[in-house]
C-alpha cells in the first residue's frame, strides 16, 4: 500500500488532505440569550438576558450553555440549571424550548445533538423550560418529569416466566407488528410532545408505550389493564387531552407518528365495549 506523499519532518496537519474546512472550523458567532430563570415551582420566574461571544458553530447547544455557566461561575453568579445526561440523543433527559420550538429548529434532533451552526450570528434566542401542568419546574430550565415514571409504573411492563431463557422463535411475531412495536419503542420519554401540544397532552408518549407492548405477544397478558391504567394515570398527572394538532409528532426527536395514539384509542375503546 502506498503511503501519502507527505514530506518527512512536516506535520501532517500542513497537508490539506488531513485537514478539515478551516473556514468552517474557525467560524464563531455572537448570540443574545434570553433565558428563563426561576428558583423553584413555588416562586415567580423571569427572563434574564446574557450576551455570548465567540461561540464555536461546531459546539452543541448544551456545550454552549456549559461555556455560559463557566463564565457565570467565574463572575460569582448562579449558573443556569438544565437537565442533561448522555448528550447522545438517547436518554431523553435534556430538553428546552428555543424560540417556541421544543429541542430547537432542527427536526428529529434532541437538544444535546443540536449544533450552534443552526443559528445565525447576532441572533436572539429565547430559551424556556417545558411548560405543562404535569412538568413542574425544579429550577430554571430543569423540570420534574417523574409523572412519566408514574405512568410507566401504572402499566408499562410485561409479565414473564422466571427461569431459563426461552428458545429462539418460540413466540412468532408478524413483521408488521414488529415494525410498529420497534417504531414506538424509539420513544425516549423526553417530554417534547407535551411541551409542543397546545393542550399539554402526553398522548403521544402514552400511545407509544402502549402500542410498543400491545403489538407483541409478550405484552398480551396485561393488554387490557395496561391501556386503562396508563391512560388513567396520565389523567391523574394533569396532562391535557389530544385535539389532533399534531404538534407532538412535529416536535418528537424520534419522529414518532401519531398513528400510535390511534392504536391506543382503539385498544381503549375495545376494553370499554359492553
Model segments located where?
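Short strand-turn-strand beta-turns centered on an Asx-Gly dipeptide
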Residues: 36, 52-53, 98-100
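Short, structured protein-protein interaction patches enriched in aromatics and acidic/basic residues
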Residues: 81-93
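Eukaryote-biased recognition of intrinsically disordered, low-complexity regulatory segments
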Residues: 28-50
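Glycine-rich phosphate/adenylate-binding loop and adjacent beta-alpha elements
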Residues: 98-122, 127
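Ferredoxin-type iron-sulfur electron-transfer modules in oxidoreductases and energy-metabolism complexes
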Residues: 59-78, 126-274
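Short, contiguous acidic and Ser/Thr-rich linear segments
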Residues: 48-59
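Intrinsic disorder/low-complexity segments
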Residues: 1-25
Amino acid at each position: 500500500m502506498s503511503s501519502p506523499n507527505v514530506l518527512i519532518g512536516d506535520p501532517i496537519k500542513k497537508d490539506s488532505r488531513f485537514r478539515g474546512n478551516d473556514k468552517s472550523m474557525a467560524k464563531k458567532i455572537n448570540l443574545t440569550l434570553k433565558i428563563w430563570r426561576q428558583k423553584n415551582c413555588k416562586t415567580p420566574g423571569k427572563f434574564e438576558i446574557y450576551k455570548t461571544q465567540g461561540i464555536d458553530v461546531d459546539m452543541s447547544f448544551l456545550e454552549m450553555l456549559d461555556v455560559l455557566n463557566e463564565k457565570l461561575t467565574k463572575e460569582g453568579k448562579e449558573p443556569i440549571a438544565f437537565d442533561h445526561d448522555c448528550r447522545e440523543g438517547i436518554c431523553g433527559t435534556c430538553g428546552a424550548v428555543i424560540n417556541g420550538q421544543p429541542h430547537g429548529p432542527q427536526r428529529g434532533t434532541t437538544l444535546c445533538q443540536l449544533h450552534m451552526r443552526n443559528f445565525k450570528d447576532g441572533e436572539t434566542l429565547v430559551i424556556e423550560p417545558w411548560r405543562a401542568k404535569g412538568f413542574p419546574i425544579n429550577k430554571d430550565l430543569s423540570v420534574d418529569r417523574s409523572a412519566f415514571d408514574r405512568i410507566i409504573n401504572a402499566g408499562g411492563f410485561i409479565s414473564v416466566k422466571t427461569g431459563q431463557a426461552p428458545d429462539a422463535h418460540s413466540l412468532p411475531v408478524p413483521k408488521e407488528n414488529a415494525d410498529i412495536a420497534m417504531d414506538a419503542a424509539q420513544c425516549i420519554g423526553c417530554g417534547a410532545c407535551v411541551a409542543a401540544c397546545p393542550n399539554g397532552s402526553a398522548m403521544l408518549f402514552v400511545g407509544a408505550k402502549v402500542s410498543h407492548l400491545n403489538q407483541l405477544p409478550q405484552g398480551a397478558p396485561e393488554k387490557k389493564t395496561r391501556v386503562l391504567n396508563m391512560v388513567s394515570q396520565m389523567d391523574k398527572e394533569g396532562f391535557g387531552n389530544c385535539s389532533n394538532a399534531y404538534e407532538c409528532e412535529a416536535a418528537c426527536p424520534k419522529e414518532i407518528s401519531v398513528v400510535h395514539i390511534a392504536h391506543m384509542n382503539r385498544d381503549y375503546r375495545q376494553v370499554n365495549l359492553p
